[in-house]
């Protein structure tokens, strides 16, 4: 039984990393195609799961068709999370002064985000639905394209994922526009290590 659990944990973690890499690609495609441009300056903005997956129009004039992310990301729980393969996923976009705003269950509105910062910044976390049973590591990525990981048993279950700034350097506490804590301690007190 321990070997089966270890195999399942490994498979779930591998799937979470692959999903984050898929989100990176989807965000790049969405932003470069200027699917959302709330300030009408001709520069595209990054999106939330509802927008990327075609689950709703969000900040766009119409629902994205075809979507750039799997339809499995159309339904968010009350905490703004999507559950996939033993992991919860959450997107944060920048609000005023670069503060991370988690995606609401119904998706983002223009009033929630900073229309200039969202042209250059987003981040996403993945953490176990049940630490030790569905996964051990928590993962992070953003527009830079790196995936980093840490192990923290507190990141387990719905509404108990990392704060928006958890994987950023302490000097950038409170914001998602700063430097990622790659190989060093982040705002959450954990060391975040790059995943290959």
Explain the meaning of each model-derived region.
Residues 22-144, 151-153, 166, 171-189, ...:
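Extracellular/periplasmic head regions of type IV pilus-like filament subunits
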């Amino acid at each position: 039984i321990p070997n089966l659990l270890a195999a399942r944990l490994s498979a779930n973690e591998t799937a979470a990393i692959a999903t984050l890499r898929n989100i990176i690609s989807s965000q790049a495609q969405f932003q470069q195609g200027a699917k959302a441009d709330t300030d009408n300056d001709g520069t595209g903005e990054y999106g939330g799961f509802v927008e990327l997956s075609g689950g709703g129009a969000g900040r766009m004039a119409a629902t994205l068709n075809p979507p750039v992310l799997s339809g499995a990301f159309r339904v968010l729980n009350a905490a703004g999370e999507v559950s996939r393969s033993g992991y919860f996923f959450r997107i944060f976009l920048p609000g005023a002064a670069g503060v991370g705003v988690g995606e609401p269950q119904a998706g983002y509105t223009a009033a929630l985000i900073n229309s200039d910062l969202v042209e250059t910044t987003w981040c996403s976390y993945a953490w176990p639905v049940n630490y030790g049973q569905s996964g051990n590591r928590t993962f992070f990525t953003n527009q830079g394209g790196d995936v980093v990981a840490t192990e923290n048993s507190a990141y387990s279950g719905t509404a108990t994922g990392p704060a928006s700034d958890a994987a950023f350097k302490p000097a950038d506490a409170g914001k998602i526009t700063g430097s990622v804590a790659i190989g060093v301690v982040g705002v959450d007190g954990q060391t975040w290590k790059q995943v290959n």
